[in-house]
Amino acid sequence: MEKARRDIRALSLDELRRFFTSHSLPAFKGNQVYEWLWNKGSHDFLGMTNLSKSHRSLLEDHFVINHIAVDQLQRSDDGTIKNAIRLHDGYLVESVLIPTDTRSTACVSSQVGCSLDCHFCATAKLKRMRNLNPDEIYDQVVEIDKQSQLYYNRPLTNIVFMGMGEPLMNYKNTLAAIDKITSPDGLGMSPKRITVSTSGITKIIREISEQNPKFKLAVSLHSAIEETRNRLMPFTKSFPLDQLLEALKYWYDKTKSKITFEVVVWKGINDKQADIDALVSYCKQVPSKVNLIEYNAIGDDQFAQARPMAISAYTTALKDNRISVTVRRSRGKDIDAACGQLANKNH
């Protein structure tokens, strides 16, 4: 029976070097292969021209190079670009380039589907099929960086893990991808320009805090009232607000990095004064700021955007309590590329 070939990009530099020495070949050959894979983006062994034919054949015998491909590209009227990314096993994920006058932000996915069940999110309606590998996350960033330079004449400035999936339910691969993105051997991007958004997996927040991460953390909160949050995000019954707060305090103690709370305000759900007061009280307990996010419809009439006066009431209360707040206007709504809309609908 033929032995299955391993994806070579799952190997570290040290593992590549050891592969060559185990075949009585110089270790530096591993460095050459590593450069082809990560600096030059090679998708086949044939093009690794500084390796002999016999060395390339050796690699072919033992490994494959799995890579992503853009299956479909859609451009929004506002310039946003949504990619349907085909993985090596046929699954699809979506990633988005969000341009502004001064920034180019990549919104990347971490899972095929999602592990969680947030009622307001289109991705949650998809069954989680598997986690993305580090190279599949990294490749999304590389692809979007190319698009930013092609269409907007500038490299990526920011990365947000706010696409399909819960990053902390795939945290090892997410962290490995970030290591590669920030490494001089990868894209060399500052970790301070990377934000990982989570629905609040408290145990993993604590575990990651121990590793002295340099990226920013955002929490999909939506309500600081337990009953309301559980109704919106049923899985949060396992991660109550008091436990989440303690985990976030631990994060701040370890990193000294403020948390961003993400809050979508819906009509009749979390637009009352009690909701505002609860959020203000919660934010006061840990260094934080708030992003108020416009709701993007997903074809489910149980949710509707709150009235402007409700958003204004939130903004005023937060500012009055010296809590930084930004109202985020969604981009790419016309191509289902906005926050909460990624669901492989058009493929």
PLM regions: where:
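Auxiliary Fe-S-binding modules of radical SAM enzymes
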Residues: 1-92, 99, 249-258, 265-347
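Alpha-helix N-cap/helix-start and coil->helix boundary motif
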Residues: 13, 115, 201-203, 226, ...
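Short linear Ser/Thr-Pro motifs
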Residues: 76, 109-110, 197, 220
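Generic beta-strand structural signal
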Residues: 81, 93, 104-108, 116, ...
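Residue-level structural signal for beta-strand termini and adjacent loop
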Residues: 97-98, 173
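Canonical Radical SAM [4Fe-4S] cluster-binding loop centered on the CxxxCxxC motif
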Residues: 99-142
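Conserved AdoMet/S-adenosylmethionine-binding subsite of the radical SAM
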Residues: 145-321
